[in-house]
């Protein structure tokens, strides 16, 4: 029993809306209460009740090295002693920016911000300022943070909680957001045929991670690049999840497609609040103070996040991505076989160190097919795995994550737990 977690959740609901500071954490999508975490190390979470869980959420993506990696924590400890915020430039901003520019093919310059949402909203403003256009092409079920233009048919917590429409967002705002199904290039072509002269940008999760994991079909990203080139629009890759995860150079390196703008977050802060957006030099130089597109932030480039980011990227630059991907592929193959053996419909999408268990017989290639998965089966699976010490995302519309800290024994423990699940 998670008694202390339950007590804290009850108290939190009196003080914090829904008892949480981000909706999906409330575990409403899986008919459960949240666990309150006391500490984390490696692949493990430790709750306030003294329970230990093997973590396959990784703080929703940042912890690719696992929790409390010694090089990252040492860097943060050293940074704390130098001051937590200056409101002025620091050397580590330059160092981290150089590492990002060196790693990502589509980034000549980068601006640090404080979250993925801030990165995407700033990138959209820049795209509109650069092109002089207003409309945005977005994909149904993709999630780009909670800024108003992105909440039309969004994934992640919006999908988990089945929130209808966009309450609080003016219709005039989302009117400029044009929607297409993910992986449907023909639908995007139709949008450009109707609105091509008004479209400032396409924004896309190069690998969708917020409708569950959905990889791009062959030719999809290439087609988006071609359409943008033909119509003078910008291609924005949202790499908040995929950046430094699907390869050290992100999805753009893995798939060989160079976007005009890239948004980042999660991993580049090593677990501290951070975001960034970058792109071609001529576009990025339109940002104030060298250009007329305004964006600012009191804590942008703060020394703690910069130190954590530098240490994280240093370790990742010498990490065995191919080895981790091979281990995850073998693990997922066995997990799928175990679940299919129980007589339930199941498909597991996987790419790099991410995967999602979809309880459906149909291929999942977009949000519509993701919604065919049986939510009740996922809830049962989640509860039974959690009861055995396996911590999965409390939503069928999120990706599970495997870190470099996960051992073969950790993966075997999840497989053993899956064998004990009944439906």
Curated annotation (Swiss-Prot):
Recorded GO MF terms: glutamate-1-semialdehyde 2,1-aminomutase activity; pyridoxal phosphate binding; transaminase activity
N6-(pyridoxal phosphate)lysine: residues bearing it: 266
Sorted UniProt keywords: Cytoplasm, Isomerase, Porphyrin biosynthesis, Pyridoxal phosphate
Gene Ontology cellular component list: cytoplasm
One Pfam family matching this protein: Aminotran_3
Location of this chain's protein in the cell: Cytoplasm
One GO term of the biological process aspect: protoporphyrinogen IX biosynthetic process
Main location, first listed in the record: cytoplasm
Family, as annotated: Belongs to the class-III pyridoxal-phosphate-dependent aminotransferase family. HemL subfamily.
Subunit structure and binding partners: Homodimer.
Name the record gives this protein: Glutamate-1-semialdehyde 2,1-aminomutase
Organism: Nitratidesulfovibrio vulgaris (strain ATCC 29579 / DSM 644 / CCUG 34227 / NCIMB 8303 / VKM B-1760 / Hildenborough)
